[in-house]
């Protein structure tokens, strides 16, 4: 890779950019102006390389990967792009020479508001790895104006605020209005015969213009550049000047406002018809624009669609982009004149599906009437796909109950996961356990009929970002022990650290690195939230999307128990213990919001109890996001991965903690199973029911009261929910939810969890043993690198060569 700048040439480029774009010079520029100048200078370099990459891809007729995801949780881009381009040291020095503090400038950049949780972060990691591995790839999503939301905690409760990330973030975007695509909703279908072919046209539809805003993505140690194409929504109709002249200003701009609503926010609330309609519009808008763009570029290169599947593979990240299947069929038949069989043959060899959940409520289903009204032609095609699929299923199984389960359209609903399975060349889960559950339970009949479609690709993380970039102290240790920077392209080189697991000097250095990271995070937390953290305390962390199956509430129950023990015996805790939470709840998820309120109520109670001072602390970090995780991961010592076994598809936070030397307290769920495969019992703190045991317990009749009646400590803990804490709020609703149904088996695992936490705290006191375990975790984390996962996709699903 050619390094684009020296420190001096970078200084000159920044000064020139400030003058040309902002009419100022370094001595007068604001931090915001300098931040944008940095982004624009790096964007220029990447854009030039992107042009060269596209030219080579077209000339050599390389097969291309198209990665569709409703989320791309990119985080901040300046430091990442400078790192990948090999100019991070030069950028820091240049900024210093120009009178700016690089650290302050990096902190000023907002996270790109394009995602919510693990789904979007995975997509971002994979895009980085695809680029680093020199795979011609494009990511596709929506250019959300406000993204998810900015979380504010007010009186202990979550309040959602708009997250306007584009102020600075727009500097990374390259608008391409000349490549805009028209997307049609509603309308009336008219059929006619011409030249022996049936033609179908959609008349009187509402048209929205999808305008691409491209974010260029640099890979590590390569001149290869890929693109994240984000679709912005625009009206095709200008403001009605006649209405405007009459003073009807809102009505004059109605079409414009309705169109732009599509790209306003990620996951609009869908517990009403308008919300469902907007979500479906978002999904079709993003899919239709993407497919049109892919097809247009393919035709420019090859002049035919007959070889589409040979030169393109479309990976759909969960069911949100599932409409890509009927949309491809629509274009192949209605616009390219193919017959059904030819169009289906190409489509079903072009699309691959990654499943990310076993939760039934997350396997999307759309009301048939809504699809029929909004997308009349797509609905016709779905009907025919469903009819042919049902015929195939009936001929294979001869069982009406199986036909019902596998149906794409049934009971007035369109089942998107079944559509993906029917129309995809591949179906993969994201951990070994998850993929087995898909084959044995969720899609067991599909697996029986078409076993060759099903495979596993365990998730991975961008180890360059989540170790080297955010944890320079640990990066230095790895380089010293594992052969320099070789591990950045060959993450399995981390395994070399295993040889030092009993080296006292290495373990002492590892301990010092963790201590410094804790001090650094404590300073960050004080400045950001005004909270005081004791670096001597155990940093026990659970940060992830708030959902009942992830069992933040189980963590809370253990903390309440610990608090009650401390009230009984102030000497029962000798080592300070800080529990750190970070989580956003979906705006309409009332129970999740109540759990956030509970965490903050408990934190407030403990902080005002003098018996807890210097012994027990609970901190909820508001607005958890990628940039906050980057501060927290290096300082974390205990990683809480405690989902109900069989419910978490994989998880990637568990991998990030592991890579930074935190020890896992967890169930055998998701990728924890594969972590256990490489770590063994001795290097993590496992507890609780296994997936098959949990399923059996539920099937045979789970009665929470049986566990309560045999455990006085549990009963006392639960009663605390009813009583509430110093803010006077009762959590009777959560109490009743646990004792009456406890869907995610918190009480069944409560005692084992408390025991696991006790084992962890005891082990923590033996620093040599703890650091020995920590080093093994780091050494064996290389298998969870995104480079490995992307290489598996490339070899086993996409059939594309890679570096």
Regions flagged by a language model, labelled:
Residues 1-803:
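A conserved ligand/cofactor-binding region detector
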């Amino acid at each position: 890779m050619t390094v684009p700048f020296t420190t001096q040439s970078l200084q000159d480029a920044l000064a020139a950019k400030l003058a040309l774009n902002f009419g100022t010079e370094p001595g007068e520029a604001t931090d915001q102006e300098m931040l944008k100048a940095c982004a624009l200078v790096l964007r220029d370099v990447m854009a030039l390389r992107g042009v060269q990459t596209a030219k080579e891809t077209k000339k050599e007729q390389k097969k291309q990967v198209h990665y569709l995801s409703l989320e791309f949780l990119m985080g901040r881009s300046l430091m990442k792009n400078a790192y990948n381009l090999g100019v991070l040291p030069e950028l820091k020095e240049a900024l210093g020479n120009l009178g700016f503090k690089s650290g302050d400038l990096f902190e000023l950049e907002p996270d790109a508001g394009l995602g919510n949780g693990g789904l979007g972060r995975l997509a971002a990691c994979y895009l980085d790895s695809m680029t680093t591995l020199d795979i011609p790839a494009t990511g596709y999503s929506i250019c959300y104006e406000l993204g998810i939301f900015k979380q504010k905690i007010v009186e202990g409760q979550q309040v959602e605020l708009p997250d306007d990330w584009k102020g600075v973030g727009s500097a990374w975007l390259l608008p391409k209005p000349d490549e805009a695509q028209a997307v049609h909703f509603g309308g009336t279908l008219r059929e006619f015969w011409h030249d022996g072919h049936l033609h179908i046209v959609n008349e009187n539809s509402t048209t929205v213009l999808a305008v691409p805003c491209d974010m260029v993505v640099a890979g590590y140690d390569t001149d290869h550049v890929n693109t994240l194409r984000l679709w912005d929504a625009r009206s095709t109709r200008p403001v009605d000047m006649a209405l405007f002249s009459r003073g009807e200003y809102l009505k004059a701009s109605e079409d414009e406002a309705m169109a732009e609503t599509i790209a306003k926010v990620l996951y609009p609330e869908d517990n009403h018809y308008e919300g469902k309609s907007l979500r479906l519009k978002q999904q079709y808008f993003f899919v239709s624009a993407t497919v049109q763009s892919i097809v247009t570029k393919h035709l420019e290169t090859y002049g035919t669609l007959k070889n589409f599947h040979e030169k393109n593979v479309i990976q759909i990240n969960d069911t949100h982009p599932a409409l890509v299947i009927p949309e491809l069929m629509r274009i192949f038949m209605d616009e390219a004149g193919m017959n059904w069989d030819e169009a289906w043959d190409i489509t079903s060899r072009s699309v691959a599906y990654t499943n990310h959940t076993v939760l039934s409520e997350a396997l999307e289903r759309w009301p048939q009437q809504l699809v029929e009204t909004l997308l009349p032609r797509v609905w016709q095609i779905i009907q025919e796909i469903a009819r042919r699929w049902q015929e195939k299923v009936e001929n294979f199984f001869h069982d009406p109950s199986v036909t019902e389960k596998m149906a794409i359209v049934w009971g007035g609903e369109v089942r998107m996961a079944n559509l993906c399975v029917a129309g995809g060349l591949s179906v993969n889960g994201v951990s070994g356990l998850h993929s087995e559950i898909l084959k044995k339970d969720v899609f067991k009949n599909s697996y029986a009929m078409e076993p060759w479609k099903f495979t596993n690709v365990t998730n991975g993380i961008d180890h360059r970002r989540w170790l080297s970039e955010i944890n320079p102290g640990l990066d230095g240790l790895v380089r010293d022990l594992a052969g320099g920077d070789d591990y950045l392209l060959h993450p399995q080189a981390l395994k070399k650290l295993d040889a030092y697991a009993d080296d006292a000097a290495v373990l002492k250095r590892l301990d010092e690195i963790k201590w410094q990271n804790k001090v650094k995070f404590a300073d960050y937390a004080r400045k950001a939230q005004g909270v005081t953290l004791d670096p001597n305390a155990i940093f026990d962390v659970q940060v992830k999307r708030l959902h009942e199956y992830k069992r933040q509430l189980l963590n809370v129950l253990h903390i309440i128990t610990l608090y009650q023990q401390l009230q009984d015996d102030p000497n029962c805790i000798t080592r300070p213990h800080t529990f750190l939470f970070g989580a956003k709840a979906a705006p309409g998820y009332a129970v999740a919001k109540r759990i956030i309120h509970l965490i903050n109520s408990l934190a407030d109670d403990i902080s005002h109890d003098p018996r807890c001072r210097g012994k027990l602390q609970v901190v909820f970090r508001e607005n958890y996001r990628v940039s906050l995780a980057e501060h927290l991961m290096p300082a974390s010592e205990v990683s809480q991965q405690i989902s109900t076994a069989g419910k978490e598809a994989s998880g990637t936070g568990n991998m990030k903690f592991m890579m930074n030397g935190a020890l896992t307290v967890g169930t055998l769920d998701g990728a924890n199973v594969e972590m256990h495969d490489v770590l063994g019992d001795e290097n993590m703190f496992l507890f609780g029911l296994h997936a098959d045991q949990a399923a059996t317990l539920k099937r045979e009749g789970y009665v929470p009261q049986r566990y309560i009646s045999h455990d006085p400590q549990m009963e006392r803990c639960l009663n605390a929910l009813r009583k509430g804490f110093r803010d006077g709020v009762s959590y009777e609703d959560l109490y009743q939810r646990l004792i009456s149904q406890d869907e995610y088996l918190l009480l069944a695992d409560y005692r084992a969890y408390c025991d696991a936490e006790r084992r962890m705290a005891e082990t923590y006191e033996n620093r040599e043993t703890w650091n020995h375990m920590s080093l093994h975790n780091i050494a064996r984390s290389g298998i969870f690198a995104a480079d490995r996962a992307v290489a598996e996709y490339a070899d086993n699903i996409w059939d594309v060569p890679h570096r």
